[in-house]
């Protein structure tokens, strides 16, 4: 499965991930989002999504490892992938039937969202 990770760019942006090459994704408080983090497996693909004023998918990453030993604070190590050729905006997502039932649209505050293959391709411009 693929996932989308939301981040406020003023806190940690895709540019920060590009600089760092890898990071640990943790500190997620929503129980559904934590469950999605715990379900991740090494090698799975991620879309990095900027919240706030940008509201757009900006790049990709890959799951390196998952430490779910603390159910209330699962930690996922991710490594940077590629920047999108252009950001894919929330308006584009909402206009696409691929996302009609997606938590990305239906649960706007969810910070870790499962994606299917077609959604991943749309969000990355593939």
What are these regions (language model features)?
Residues 1, 21, 42-44, 57-59, ...:
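A generic structural signal for short beta-strands and their flanking turns/coil linkers
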Residues 1-42:
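Compositionally biased, charged N-terminal/linker segments
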Residues 1-11, 29, 68-126:
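Contiguous surface segments at macromolecular interaction interfaces
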Residues 15-19, 62-64, 91-96:
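Surface-exposed flexible segments
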Residues 42-47, 112:
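Hydrophobic/aromatic beta-strand segments within beta-rich folds
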Residues 47-48, 62:
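Hydrophobic beta-strand signal
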Residues 49-55:
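Short, charged beta-turn/beta-strand-edge "cap" motif at the junction between a beta-strand
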Residues 56-67:
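Short beta-strand-centered aromatic/proline hotspots
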């Amino acid at each position: 499965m693929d996932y989308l990770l939301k981040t406020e760019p003023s806190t940690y942006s895709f540019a920060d991930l590009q600089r760092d090459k890898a990071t640990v994704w943790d500190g997620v408080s929503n129980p559904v989002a934590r469950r999605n983090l715990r379900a991740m497996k090494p090698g799975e693909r991620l879309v990095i999504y900027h919240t706030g004023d940008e509201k757009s998918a900006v790049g990709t990453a890959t799951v390196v490892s998952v430490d779910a030993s603390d159910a209330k604070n699962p930690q996922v190590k991710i490594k940077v992938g590629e920047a999108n050729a252009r950001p894919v905006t929330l308006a584009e997502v909402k206009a696409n039937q691929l996302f009609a039932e997606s938590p990305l649209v239906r649960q706007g505050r969810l910070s870790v969202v499962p994606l299917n293959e077609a959604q991943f391709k749309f969000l990355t411009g593939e």
